Amino acid sequence: MIRIICGGKKNAGAYSEIIAEYEKRLRKPYDIHWEFYEEEKLLKKLEKWPFDEASEYVICCDERGKNISSDEYSSILTGVFENGRDVVILIGGAYGFDKSVREKADFVWSFSRLVFPHQLFRTMVVEQIYRAQEISRGGKYHHE
């Protein structure tokens, strides 16, 4: 399972429809569970680092992270699932995450050095999860 933990408001509007369409296509272990927190509450939650290293692999989305290909992302997720762990993806609010969160995460993932609107970025994350699933299973969605 993939937990996506977000700072800010719930998915809404046209983006939520696109996200829902990708979610319908996802199969275990790529299924998604969303958690939304007001930004301050999310930062307080992360101070306590509520994740279990043995069972959860934490990916922090941040423009200061590592930029990887879809194939590399698929390999990361496949490896995590093969080791019996779940994935947690952290998506920050307007101010992102501080250094302590980035340092504790197993992987800091950058889509780009650009900053994206929250709803668009969440949509892109879900699309990449679907793409990773399809790469892993040899589907026709991803083309090289």
Locations of regions flagged by a protein language model:
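Conserved strand-to-helix beginnings and helix N-cap segments that scaffold or border functional pockets
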Residues: 15-19, 70-74, 102, 122
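Short glycine-rich anion-binding loops that position phosphate/pyrophosphate groups of nucleotides
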Residues: 10, 63-66, 93-96
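Catalytic beta-strand/loop module used to bind and position nucleotide/cofactor moieties
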Residues: 72-99, 107-116
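Short, aromatic/basic amphipathic alpha-helical patches
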Residues: 17-24, 47-50, 101
